[in-house]
Structure formats: structure tokens, C-alpha cells
Amino acid sequence: MKFTHLYIPHKFNYYFMDLISGVEKGFSKLEFLSCNTNINDDTLIGLVEICKSIKELELYITKQPTTKILSSFINLKSLELYDNSRPMSWNCLENLSLPYLQILKATGIPIKVLTSLIDHTNGHLIEIKIDHISHNEISNKKIIQTIYKKCPNLEYLKLLFINNNILELRELLINCNHLIGLYIIFEDVWDVNVMIDYNIIFKILSDNSSISLFKLKFYYHREPELKSFEFFFDNWKIRIPMRPILLQTIQYHVLYGSEHFDLIEKYKKNGIVKKYENALSENTFQDFEW
């Protein structure tokens, strides 16, 4: 029997290699591994030795893995990292090279090390999700620039755009012209005192989006004014009339007035918006579900 998926439970204290002694070949085609990094280090090392075929790795972090472990998965195509709010440097990701990585999902992981990780990929990334990590304007600008320089084939992106870096969105749209879905977290989600200029953002989107991009998700504290939405939809109709928008909005406490729904309904009838949904929680939808 050949196994393709393996899930190792939390606090697994047995030496896994002893348990599978004599049947190692059954794991030689393993493609997916899910485990907690609190398991016995020898187990991870043993798996590395026999599981060169692993393409998707899901780690539940309670202590930092070593660079040696992660760098051993040279064929890795999907990496999901979740930091459960424990303060860690995550320097194990710096200078890590995963040349075939296609999907990167990171929650609570320092931006600096994620920037380094993306910088050491070979242009195969098609999906990036980064959230729940506070960072400054400089770090935010750096990761946006790294993404549009290193990820020409990107199709889906979830990322915070700090207000002063919003002009970088133009470069991202131009360089990542295979984008299908874009999930923007606006800075006022983190700081309610920040005022977002949606006219600039919507102009950048309507002027520079490729024909492939039609799935949009906005997470903000304060909704755009009606005239900003009108400006956006009217410009989209002129530039990309054959690509109606799938739009989701997520608000932080503040509710739309009915006039916003009435406006969007008008553009649905005109064929500019294909589908619209609004929610108060980011957990209502899957990140790249429209």
C-alpha cells in the first residue's frame, strides 16, 4: 500500500520511524504532510529521509522548526504557516529556498521573513495569503515590491496595503497581470484613524487591472462613499465591460446604509457587477471564495 497523505497528531511523542520500520516504501510517494512542530524532532528528520516527494506541508507551530527540516522539502508546492501568537523570530524561513513553491498561506508570520521567503522562490507562486500580522510602512512596501518582482504568475493575493503604499498597487497590477482574485485589507482595519482615499484606489484598479482580474474583496473599517463606488463601476464598465465583477466587502463594525446596496444593485442590473456579498466578519467567506 502506498500512502499519499499523512496527518501526525499534536504531542505525538513516539518515534515514528520505529512504528513504520519495514514498511518505509509505503511512504515513498507521500505528497501531503500535516503535523505539529512540537513532535519528536527525530520523527521529522526521519520523514525527510524517506519522503522526498512531499509537495504540500502544513505545520502547526508551537516551536520553531529548523531550517534543515524545511529546506529538505525541495519539491514543496504548498506551504501553510500559522503562528498561534507566541513571539518567535521565524528566522528559520530567512534564506530558505523553495524553488517550486506555488501556494503560500501565512497567518501571524513576520513580514520580514515572508519577504525573504518570497524573494527566494523561482516565479512559480500563484497564490499568496498573508494576514493577521502588524507591520510598518517600510516592511509593507518591501513585501509588495517583492511580490510584483518575483511572482509574475500570481493569480490570487490577500495582503494588507498600508495607505502610504497604495501607489504600489499600480505596479503590482501591471507586473502580476495574471491576477484573477485580489483581496485587499485596508489600513483602517488596524488603525481606525486612517482615512482611505478610495478615489485613488479605485482609479488604480480600473485603469490597470488586466482582463483576467474580476474577483475583488475589500476588508475595511469605513466604507467608501457612494460617489467613489460610482466612479469605480463606471470606469470598470468603460475599460473592462466584458468582465463583470464578483465583489465581496467585509466591514469592521460599521454597517452600510441601504443606499450603498441600492447603488450596487443598480450596477448588477447593468451587468457591471455579477455578484455582491457583504459581511461583518472575515471568517464568513473562505479567503479566495467568491
Question: Where do the language-model regions lie?
Answer:
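The conserved beta-strand core of Leucine-Rich Repeat
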Residues: M1-W290
